[in-house]
Amino acid sequence: CLKKRQLGTLDCKTAFLTGRKHDRDIYCRPPKDGLPGVAPGSLLKIVKGAYGLREAPRLWYLKARDTLLDAGFEEMQTARACFVLHDRKESEPVNVGMLVLHVDDACYAGEGPMFEKAMEHIRSKFTIGKEEHGEFTFLGRRVKQNSDFSVEIDQHDYVKALERVVVARERRQQSTSPLTSKELHDY
């Protein structure tokens, strides 16, 4: 149970660029504007994930998972990208923390020296951008932890930002008709 534990979120900057190395050879040319210190016409070898490569998200995830495992977390078998940290010094393991990973964003809750040490390990391995506690946005949801440690989650800002879609009365009556090309483009 994660009662009375501070919630937090963090963002790993340039996540795809810190993923595992590729297991194949990938080459590219520098941009037309050039790169400092790279001769025009050079051929560059990409050794790690890069934005746009199909395996970049997987390479990042594997690196992040390895780092969390090294920090002492265990990946839940029933919910991949959900990690728990147990103190196994007692006869029964005691849950001291949890972390959920979604691409380069993490939401976590935990307490105590073991949890803090694990989080410091994670912070030492990645460039952390924004890290917030108490009230923050995670995956488009506003998360607010109250002083009694209860948690409120809503999507008020997301709903307010939605654009109203006006559908003509005659079109509403054709609810089983396929979308027109204009409708596909507009919505």
Task: Please place each PLM-identified region on the residue numbering.
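Long, low-complexity, charge-biased intrinsically disordered regions
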Residues: 1-187
